[in-house]
A protein has these predicted regions:
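Small-side-chain secondary-structure face that scaffolds active or pore-lining regions
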Residues: 119-132, 138, 147-159, 218-220, ...
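Extracytoplasmic gating/loop element in the C-terminal half of outer-membrane beta-barrel translocons
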Residues: 70-72, 83, 206, 259-262, ...
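Outer-membrane beta-barrel signature, preferentially recognizing the C-terminal barrel domain
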Residues: 25, 209-212, 340-357, 445-488, ...
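Residues embedded in well-ordered regular secondary structure
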Residues: 8-9, 16-123, 158-162, 182-195, ...
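Outer-membrane beta-barrel proteins
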Residues: 1-20, 38-43, 79-96, 104, ...
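Surface-exposed loop/turn segments flanking beta-strands in extracellular/periplasmic regions
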Residues: 46-77, 165-207, 252-275, 316-344, ...
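Outer-membrane beta-barrel transmembrane domain signature of Gram-negative proteins
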Residues: 72-100, 104, 255, 266-367, ...
Length: 795
């Protein structure tokens, strides 16, 4: 229920000690080997050079090609696998120690944990410390408690981001050539010839990762104190106050870029003159006050549970960034060591949310169930007139297996019909989205001398009419159980419609200039679908086993966009009646393989061109949707759905005596991802699928000819089926319970092997099908495959 996060609240109870139990101590630890998961298979240096010659004749002479084949001149004609150069196998170890216990009145639990993880990319890693301590006590009608937790993370990376725009993986995937060595025999890093690249893209990825550093220390502390009283039979009151503090300190140092040399030691690019230190601090304090009144009572066959509550959340954060350049030495990383171009900026924001809520549960004879929820939430992110909103929900259930007429069906264990309807709110936008915001500028001229003055300028358009987003949900479900619930199944149908979606849309007929468009409640989206679960568990002798399966389908549909029919963003489009982020491009209908294909005409008998140019053999053939005889941007349309047709998972588990085995499999079906690669001028790596490209001797190739910019256009040709089934987790263990352990104060010892992402079944080549963005290429940090060995001991 509720308005927070993604339209709801999840109630979490952390581990606590048990009453009337002796002190228990447990330790768990593991060692993990991490390896890169699915990564592209790029062509070697020789085949890359052949392809380069096809688009740029004479780039590599016959003598050069021979050297690439025999490896006789690795300085000038290398065969470098850049993924192997920047990725590695890495280790991780984790340790967790907990102590718990209690008596009739007091319970406690304390735990500490430590982990150290090396990244699979050079100079990356994470070190983490954490602790948790919970204690609660009861005195007559009163209860008191204290929860404390905290952690410290230290993340290290190179100064250049490992992935994303401008990151190392982007260089490897798009710009770095296999014919360039990582390092010359003279000790200098291999130089990427920049004749067709900007200076920014001429970087050697391994060299870039070796320069500078970036460290991020993140601290978090949580504390909560609570007290309660039993007022009378079934009526309780509890109050609590929680405080959370976050601190993030990041230091990033970029040294002067070194001179770049060729294999003969000649300078090809002079050394940079600027080094830079940039520090970033973020601190956030959040407090939460909550008061709950509950009543729980059983009257004969009637069960009543009532909750009334009030909560207030307040948060304030501060951000500061400072930078400076001109360090006389590369060994000083403090701001005071810089000499030129100092700069600093910062800001702070605050936010509050107040909620009044209630819930009534009623059950009759374990057959008829009813629940009613209501929330009244107010957010500082909304303008005063629309600050508060009310969100009700109601649900009912009928346990028909408890009806008298079902008693004769002995193998029918459970039958339950559930229905629910409700509204939830969402206010996850900026803290001041409804107001006009101001920004500083130093470019105002107020005198004839031309001196610039500092001032403030409006940066956004206000809208004091915005209100909460609202999601209306309808659920209908059927739960069934058979053979003493050894077989259980659930089928659920749902319809979720989100209205008044807050979007920033341009205002028709109004020129905003540099102003940000205002937020408006203009969107509506529906997600409708179903989910089916079935589980089977049983035992025989020393054997125990379980099987579970889940299958779901969701249809996403845009219903409204503030009067707009569509908005286009690159290779995706939002259009009424279609899913969010639908693929947008040309519809590929084949390839020009013969001279007859080149004479393809439209309905008027006109030979179809591509952007006014006659196509060539080996080009991708596109549909002329507007039938004008020329393939242009006007012929683009929706070519695919970014959402899967269905998602599924299943788990298999079994145990025999002291051995246990569990597996979890997960997959999706009917999903497509872009696997586009630029092939116009061949600036960087290409995958091995290009070995089967069109040529006069290979007219039935799967890939087009190299060198045509139209082939690089986003089209259905580059949409590949990315359905997959993956073994997400596997664990095999053995538990020692010998009597001799008890004499040493040990109750049990378990050793196990665990793995993740061990197997993947997919038709997609070279890219990880689980990558969730619209473009499937691995220019981001790859998923990892892990192998873990662990130990659990309980005293």
């Amino acid at each position: 229920y509720g308005a927070r996060a993604a339209n709801g609240v999840i109630l979490i109870t952390t581990k606590r000690g048990q009453a009337s139990s002796k002190v228990k101590v447990s330790y768990s630890g593991s060692y993990t080997l991490q390896t890169p998961g699915i990564v592209p298979d790029y062509v070697d240096g020789y085949n890359w050079a052949l392809m380069k010659n096809e688009v740029s004749t004479g780039t590599f002479s016959p003598e050069a090609l021979q050297k690439l084949q025999d490896g006789s001149d690795p300085d000038h004609y290398a065969n470098t696998n850049w993924l192997d150069a920047v990725l590695r196998n890495a280790s991780m170890h984790q340790h967790h120690l907990s102590v718990s216990g209690g008596n009739e009145n007091t319970r406690f639990m304390t735990s500490v944990a430590y982990s150290n993880q090396d990244g699979i990319m050079m100079k990356t890693g994470v070190e983490r410390f954490s602790f948790r301590s919970n204690i609660d006590t009861r005195y007559k009608r009163f209860t008191f408690g204290l929860n404390l937790s905290g952690n410290k993370n230290n993340v290290t990376t190179p100064a250049v981001a490992p992935s994303g725009e401008g990151g190392i993986m982007r260089y490897v995937s798009w710009f770095t050539r296999p014919t360039v060595p990582v390092m010359y025999s003279n000790g200098h890093y291999g130089y990427v010839d920049g004749s067709s690249l900007s200076a920014e893209l001429m970087k050697n990825p391994v060299e870039s990762m070796s320069l500078g550093h970036r460290s991020n220390e993140y601290w978090r502390f949580n504390g909560k104190v609570f007290a309660g009283i039993d007022l009378w039979d079934g009526l309780k009151f509890q109050t609590s106050f929680a405080y959370a503090f976050d601190l993030n300190a990041t230091k990033s140092y970029s040294p002067k870029s070194p001179a770049r040399y060729d294999a003969e030691g000649n300078i090809r690019k002079a050394a940079g003159e600027t080094n830079k230190e940039e520090d970033y601090w973020y601190r956030n304090a959040t407090w939460t006050s909550e008061n709950l009144l509950t009543y729980n009572k059983q009257f004969d066959k009637h069960n009543v549970n009532v909750l009334l509550g009030h909560s207030v959340i307040g948060s304030r954060f501060y951000k500061t960034t400072a930078s400076i350049q001109g360090f006389p030495t590369e060994n000083i990383y403090e701001l005071d060591g810089g000499t030129i171009n100092p700069g600093a900026k910062g800001n702070s924001e605050e936010y509050k949310l107040q909620s009044f809520f209630g819930r009534v549960n009623y059950g009759y004879d374990d057959r008829y169930l009813f629940e009613f929820n209501i929330r009244h939430d107010g957010s500082s992110r909304m303008p005063k007139a629309n600050r508060y909103a009310t969100f009700p929900s109601v649900s009912g259930g009928w346990v028909f297996s408890n009806e008298e007429l079902m008693k004769d069906y002995k193998n029918f264990s459970l039958g339950k019909l559930r229905l629910s309807w409700g509204k939830l709110g969402n206010q996850e936008i900026g803290n001041y989205a409804y107001a006009a915001t101001l920004g500083a500028s130093g470019n105002y001229f107020f005198d004839q001398g031309g001196d610039k003055q500092a001032g403030m300028v409006q940066t956004s358009v206000p809208n004091e009419d915005i209100k909460w987003e609202t999601t209306r949900s309808i659920n209908v479900a059927l739960d069934l159980g058979f053979f003493n619930n050894r077989i259980q199944t659930t089928f659920e149908w749902f319809d979720k419609k989100t209205s008044d979606i807050l979007m920033q849309l341009a205002m028709p007929g109004i020129f905003l200039g540099s102003l940000n468009a205002p937020y408006q409640n203009v969107g509506a989206v529906r997600n409708r679908g179903w989910e089916w679960n079935v589980n089977y568990s049983d035992s025989k002798g020393d054997w125990v086993w379980n099987v579970g399966f889940n299958l779901s389908h969701v249809k996403n549909e845009i219903l409204e966009m503030g009067g707009l029919e569509e908005t286009i963003s690159g290779q995706t489009i939002n259009r009424i009646g279609n899913p969010i982020g639908a693929y947008f491009g040309y519809k590929a209908i084949g390839m020009y393989r013969t001279e007859a294909d080149l004479q393809r005409t439209n309905s008027k008998g006109e030979v179809i061109k591509q952007n006014g140019v006659a196509p060539k053999l080996g080009d991708i053939m596109y549909a002329d949707l507007n039938d004008d005889g020329n393939i242009t941007a006007d012929d683009r349309d929706i070519i695919g759905n970014p959402f899967p047709k269905y998602s599924y998972s299943f788990n298999l588990g079994a145990s025999w005596k002291n051995f246990d085995l569990s597996t979890f499999w997960q997959g999706v079906g009917g999903i497509y991802r872009y696997s586009w690669e630029t092939s116009t001028d061949i600036r960087g790596n290409l995958t091995e699928r290009w070995l089967d490209r069109y040529s006069a001797g290979n007219v039935n190739a799967s890939m087009p000819a190299l060198g045509n910019t139209m082939n690089d256009s986003y089209s259905s040709f580059w949409l590949e089926n990315s359905s997959y089934l993956r073994l997400k987790n596997l664990e095999f263990g053995y538990t020692f319970r010998q009597p001799g352990l008890a004499k040493m104060g040990v109750s049990s010892v378990r050793v196990y092997f665990a793995g993740s992402n061990l197997l993947t079944f997919t038709s997609l080549k070279n890219w990880d099908p689980e990558k969730t963005s619209g473009d499937a290429r691995n220019d981001v940090h790859p998923n990892m495959r892990t192998y873990s060995f662990g130990l659990n001991i309980q005293f």
